[in-house]
Amino acid sequence: MALQNIGASNRDDAFYRYKMPRMMTKIEGRGNGIKTNVVNMVEIAKALGRPAAYTTKYFGCELGAQSKFDEKNGTSLVNGAHDTSKLAGLLENFIKKYVQCYGCGNPETEILITKTQMLQLKCAACGFLSDVDMRDKLTSFILKNPPEQKKSSKDKKSMRRAEKERLREGEAADEEMRKLKKEAASKKKAATTGTSKDKVSKKKDHSPPRSLSDENDQADSEEDDDDVQWQTDTSREAAEKRMKEQLSAVTAEMVMLSTVEEKKPVAEVKKAPEQVHENGNSKIPENAHEKLVNEIKELLSSGSSPTQLKTALASNSANPQEKMDALFSALFGGTGKGFAKEVIKKKKYLLALMMMQEEAGAPAQMGLLNGIESFCMKASAEAAKEVALVIKGLYDEDILDEDVIVEWYNKGVKSSPVLKNVTPFIEWLQNAESESEEE
């Protein structure tokens, strides 16, 4: 199929990369039923990035004749006998009005319909927005039959989340399959050992027990199948050694627990000053938050993983929000410039605590936002300035949703310095949403 450059002004440019098929027409019927069939209208419309119904309707509007495009068969018919050159000239006018950018002339545009029912061409090359003349007859047809829009950033984000969820489900299914294989291998092992014992008892074979090397060889052969490991050494010395190791681990844990219990009363004695509430004379201990922060710091300094930290805090009597506030103080206390980068770096600890909040029935994302606000109210000015970067980073990581962020912002006090720093990000979110709706 012969190709030509898109746009009459680029006809002689041998290196022009935007091309479309040369128009091919065929006269069908006779008398009053004579029609012109544009044979390759689907290919032309695809090259222009416009629905074939638009170009067919444009021919009908300009020629004052009835036109019809059949979606099922892909046939484009215009009543009457028309020359190919005449239709090609009309197609060039369509390209100038509805395809080429009014700024740079490139055909990399898409049709946008604004809220005021106006048509615009958005150029992907230069970003220019071209206003289409709404006096043209085809504009009303386009408004009634809008083009299919590309997926917005919100749709892409939901697709990314669905893909991550699919991967998690696949990993869980693989893990379940591995467990089933291990169970089948263990049952097979038990059956084989049972039959061998029966044979030995029948023959009354008093041979010595298997050597350690034989058992190791058998264990190595079974490790090739799904990494199944079996206890091989059943001698008295090995059993005593294992008992000593277990006892040493248990005693070490008991010693650590006893030292922690001994340290707690000392800390309470040292931090005994009491604080008086502003709205009453009742005295409450000031160090409840600090005790929780110190406990988390001890866990972090001992190299606890996010899962271990979650397990340790699950037994604490503090409510979920108090735990989140204490975690921020323990993780980022004293942080100034670079607060946003530190939050993203240690996001796994935040996710672990959010999971614990969800298990307790508390709103996890709202608790995280409240924790950020509470920390920034007490943090340094440099850290408080980065609160918008923190929330945007968590939003980009799919930890926070747009709806929850806006809800948290609307519930807060707008005069708060933290919310003032977040305002530009909220405006950006709302503008991005309105632009996606317009598109």
UniProtKB/Swiss-Prot annotation:
Domain W2 spans what residues? 283-439
* Keyword field contains Nucleotide-binding: yes
Compositional bias, Acidic residues, is annotated for: 214-228
Q: Which GO terms describe its molecular function?
A: GTP binding; translation initiation factor activity
Q: Which residues carry this modification: Phosphoserine?
A: S434, S436
The record's listing under Gene3D superfamilies reads: 1.25.40.180, 2.20.25.350, 3.30.30.170
Superkingdom: Eukaryota
* InterPro entries assigned: ARM-type_fold, IF2/IF5, Transl_init_fac_IF2/IF5_dom, Transl_init_fac_IF2/IF5_N, Transl_init_fac_IF2/IF5_Zn-bd, W2_domain
Compositional bias ranges of the Basic and acidic residues kind: 147-186, 234-245
User: Which CDD domains does this entry report, sorted A to Z?
Assistant: W2_eIF5
**Known Pfam families for this protein?**
eIF-5_eIF-2B, W2
Residues annotated with Phosphothreonine modification: T232
Question: Which amino acid positions bind GTP, per UniProt?
Answer: G29, R30, G31, N32, G33, I34, K35, T36
**Renumbered residue ranges of the record's region Disordered:** 143-245
Write the record's keywords in alphabetical order, separated by commas.
GTP-binding, Initiation factor, Nucleotide-binding, Phosphoprotein, Protein biosynthesis
Q: What does this protein do?
A: Catalyzes the hydrolysis of GTP bound to the 40S ribosomal initiation complex (40S.mRNA.Met-tRNA[F].eIF-2.GTP) with the subsequent joining of a 60S ribosomal subunit resulting in the release of eIF-2 and the guanine nucleotide. The subsequent joining of a 60S ribosomal subunit results in the formation of a functional 80S initiation complex (80S.mRNA.Met-tRNA[F]).
Family membership, please give it: Belongs to the eIF-2-beta/eIF-5 family.
Q: What's the protein name?
A: Probable eukaryotic translation initiation factor 5-1
Organism, as annotated: Arabidopsis thaliana
